[in-house]
Amino acid sequence: FFLTSNTFTMLLRNTLLYNILFIVLNIVIPVTLAVLINQIYSRIASKAYQTMMFFPHFLSWVVVSYFVYAFLNPDKGLMNTIIQFFGGDKIMWYSQPKWWPLILTFMQVWKSMGYNMVVYLASITGIDSTLYEAATLDGATKWQQTKYITLPALKPIIVMMFILNVGHIFYSDFGLF
C-alpha cells in the first residue's frame, strides 16, 4: 500500500532532489573554496581558514543543528539581528515550511564542505608548479590558470568525490533527515 501511495512518491522525489542538490553544492562550493584558499599567500591565514571550515565535519548532527538554531533563532539569532538592523521584520524560520529546504541544505553543505575542500586543496597542491610558472610567463591571468590548469587537473578527484557522494545517498541512517 505504501509504495503505491502519493506519500511514497513525494518522499522519494524529495529525497532525490535534496541529494542531487547536496551533491552539486558539495562539488561546486568546496572546489571554489579550495581554489580561493590556495591563492592565499599567508600560510597562517590559509591554515586558519582550513581549520575553521573543516571543524564542522567532526561535530555530530545534534551540535550542528544547535549552531544553526542559534544562527536562525527568531529572537536573538544572527540572521534576524542582521535583518532587523537593515529595517526588515524578523523571520520565524522554523515555523514556516518554505524555509526548511534552505535550512536542511545549509546544514548539510556546512557540515560536509570542509572535508571536501581539504580533499580538493590537497589535490591542488599536488599540481606541478611549473605549469603555473609557464602560464604566468605566457601572460595567463589567475582566472585563466584556474580554468585551464587547476580545474582540468581536479577532474579525476571531482569524479571520485561525485561517486562517493552518490554512495552517501544509500546510507540507511539518513543522518540529516
PLM regions and their residue ranges:
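A structural signal for multi-pass alpha-helical bundles of membrane permease subunits
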Residues: F1-F177
